[in-house]
Amino acid sequence: MPGMNVLALETSTDAGSCALLLEGRVSERICPAGRPHSETLLPLLRELMAEHGVGFAQLDAIAFGAGPGAFTGLRVACGIAQGLAVAVALPVVPVCGLEAMAATVGEARVLSLLDAHMGEVYAGAYVHGEGGQELQSEICLASPEAVELPADAGWVACGNAPA
């Protein structure tokens, strides 16, 4: 999104964060481990925006991590994003974490894997083409052994879960 100023919130995994895309540059803050995202995200968000002298009026949108991930965590980022967006009349953009990870890899075929805990992973297979990336099958929640790659070769895995 060149030229856009976007605040992004992510709390669907253990590593919560907020990021600010401002005039083509990204700055971020990571939530401290061991503390609930509901306690740490807003102070980090305020710190990040204050550091850059940015107010909500200068933003074009607010994005949030729409999962997959922990239900409580999803509600934290979604609720904060929606509350802020309504207050300042900004659009809200949901972002799939698996898709966002795949987009950063720079390979044509990417299997994104997130640890869902309790011996399971969230998985999504993406193919990058001229029009962007396309999900090859439904995102699934499964044991790592049960995750199936599409039949063709050349896949690269990314994420924090075992393949």
Question: Predicted segments — roles?
Answer:
Residues 2-66:
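N-terminal beta-alpha supersecondary unit
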Residues 15, 70, 120:
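Glycine-rich nucleotide phosphate-binding loop and flanking beta-alpha elements
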Residues 32-40, 71, 75, 79, ...:
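Residues at secondary-structure transition points
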Residues 50-57, 85-96:
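Phosphate-handling active-site elements
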Residues 63-92:
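DPxDG-like acidic metal-binding loop motif
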